[in-house]
Structure formats: C-alpha cells, structure tokens
Amino acid sequence: MQIKNASNLCEYMFSNCSRTGICFYAIPSTVKVENGSPDGNGGFGIAYKSTSEDYGMLIVFSYGKAVYMKIKSITWDNWKKVKFIE
C-alpha cells in the first residue's frame, strides 16, 4: 500500500492492517517526523496486528539506511533504531 499522507504514520499503518495480518507499505519522504516517521527519509514499512488488535509491531526500513522498530502494547513506544553487527 502506498501511504500518501498520514497525520499519524503508526496509527495509519496499524489501523489498515487486518487482524493477525502482516501488511507492507511504501512510505514516501513527504511523511515527515511530525507525522510519525522515524527520520523523515521515506522507505518501506511492515505492520503486524495481533488477534485482539491491542498489540502490534511496526518495522520501517528507511531510505536513510537505517531500520526502526516500534511496538504497541497499550500505547505506542518510541521508535527504536535497530543496530546491526557488521
């Protein structure tokens, strides 16, 4: 799915994903940090929603050569930059 504009990137990705589904999104660089983007560079994202719809996870692969993760339990955590061992 292409995200054109989102006031809250996380809620947009999460709400448009079906239960126990995994959804893939293209995120343009027009989705800025103030709209929920982790770095404003665009990229692509993966969203997962639990059966109860209370829990989920978002992973964003940024065009800025970084990977970010955000988890929802009751509320959303902050974006965490994933560090890889090279």
Where are the model-predicted features located?
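C-terminal interaction-tip segments
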Residues: 80-86
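Glycine-rich, flexible loop motifs
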Residues: 1-65, 71, 75, 80
